[in-house]
């Protein structure tokens, strides 16, 4: 499974946003009555397609979207594609980014988008070290060299701020995605997603993990978002999408090998063994105590408030600090509460 990179702060605002006409509609959930024709829903990603879309692919292959009268397609992202701007322009119906800060920053810049559910519950972004020189908590970072991608530096800064550690007490080494600097001792820790099991194999049983979430920086991974206009006028379609997708993730949880086979059949470029290794890790993030209580896709406004406050403290909002209700809504989750799987 590959690690998505959203370039949180780059090209959030495209000059061609075409968002001038996308005005927020009423706050009440609008449910359209039974249209016979299938609703076309394109989900724009911020990265190339992989195991992060296991549930969506299962839902498509098993006909769950068709049962909801949805013609569903996944639109891949990549380094030259600004998925947030594409969705904000109205070209596609919804999108998914790797991490919630992308949406917070976009809203602060005036893009009319809002999160309506999350794909997994806790962020798998992690600082990896080795047992011979372990980093098990934030304080262990003091005096250490941290290998990190340029897009992740803000996450390290957030972790340090949350734990009241001066940035000068840590050496930042900008690196790519390869774990070699950690294995050769050039750095003491290296960053990545725990779901990226293929890249982590090289660390073997010497691996020590410290999750960003456990260190106090609680960001939501794989948030689903749509424009405020879509939320106001096509809430029924988003609810159908969420019901079908939830069923797909539920099937994947109960039938992991079959789910991976469906994924690889849909996208033959993926490696079956790699996806089989990654699926259990991903599913452990998709379902936990919160989903058992509140259903797959659930999220907490208090977590959003905490991350907005932290990013404001770090000076990340160049225009204004967005309100929680501007960044996320529970309306689609509330409308699908009885249908979303409660597994944990």
Give names to the regions the model predicted.
Residues 11-32:
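N-terminal export signals
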Residues 1-7:
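Secretory targeting signals
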Residues 304-344:
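Conserved C-terminal helix/tail region of periplasmic/extracytoplasmic solute-binding proteins
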Residues 232-316:
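Secondary-structure end/capping motifs
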Residues 119-129, 201-231, 242, 280-285:
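Periplasmic-binding protein-like
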Residues 74, 171-172, 180-189, 200-209, ...:
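A residue-level marker of the well-folded mature domains of exported/periplasmic proteins
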Residues 8-9, 137:
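Residues that mark the N-terminal boundary/hinge immediately upstream of a DNA-recognition element
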Residues 36-184, 188-194, 205, 210-211, ...:
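Short, glycine-/small- and polar/acidic-enriched structural segments
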């Amino acid at each position: 499974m590959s690690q998505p990179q959203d370039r949180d702060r780059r090209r959030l605002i495209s000059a061609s946003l075409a968002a001038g006409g996308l005005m927020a509609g009423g706050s009440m959930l609008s449910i359209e009555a039974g249209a016979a024709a299938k609703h076309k829903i394109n989900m724009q990603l911020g990265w190339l397609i992989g195991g992060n879309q296991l549930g969506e692919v299962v839902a498509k292959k098993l006909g769950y979207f068709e049962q909801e009268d949805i013609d569903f397609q996944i639109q891949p992202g990549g380094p030259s594609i600004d998925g947030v701007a594409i969705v904000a322009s109205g070209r596609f119906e919804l999108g998914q980014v790797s991490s919630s800060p992308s949406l917070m920053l976009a809203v602060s810049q005036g893009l009319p988008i809002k999160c309506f559910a999350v794909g997994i519950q806790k962020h798998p972004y992690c600082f990896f070290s080795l047992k011979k020189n372990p980093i098990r908590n934030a304080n262990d970072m003091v005096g250490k060299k941290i290998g990190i991608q340029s897009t992740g530096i803000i996450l390290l800064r957030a972790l340090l701020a949350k734990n009241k550690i001066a940035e000068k007490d840590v050496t930042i080494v900008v690196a790519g995605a390869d774990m070699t600097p950690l294995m050769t001792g050039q750095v003491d820790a290296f960053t990545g997603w725990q779901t990226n099991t293929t890249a982590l194999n090289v660390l073997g049983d010497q691996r020590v993990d410290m999750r960003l979430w456990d260190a106090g920086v609680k960001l939501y991974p794989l948030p689903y978002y749509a424009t405020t206009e879509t939320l106001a006028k096509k809430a029924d379609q988003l609810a159908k999408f969420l019901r079908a997708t939830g069923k797909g993730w539920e099937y994947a949880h109960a039938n992991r090998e079959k789910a991976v086979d469906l994924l690889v059949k849909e996208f033959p470029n993926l490696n079956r063994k790699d996806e089989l290794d990654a699926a259990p890790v991903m599913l452990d993030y998709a379902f936990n105590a919160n989903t058992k209580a509140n259903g797959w896709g659930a999220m907490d406004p208090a977590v959003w408030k905490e991350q907005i406050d932290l990013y404001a403290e770090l000076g990340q909002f160049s225009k204004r600090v967005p309100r929680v209700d501007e960044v996320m809504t529970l309306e689609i989750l509330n409308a699908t509460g009885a249908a979303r799987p409660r597994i944990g």
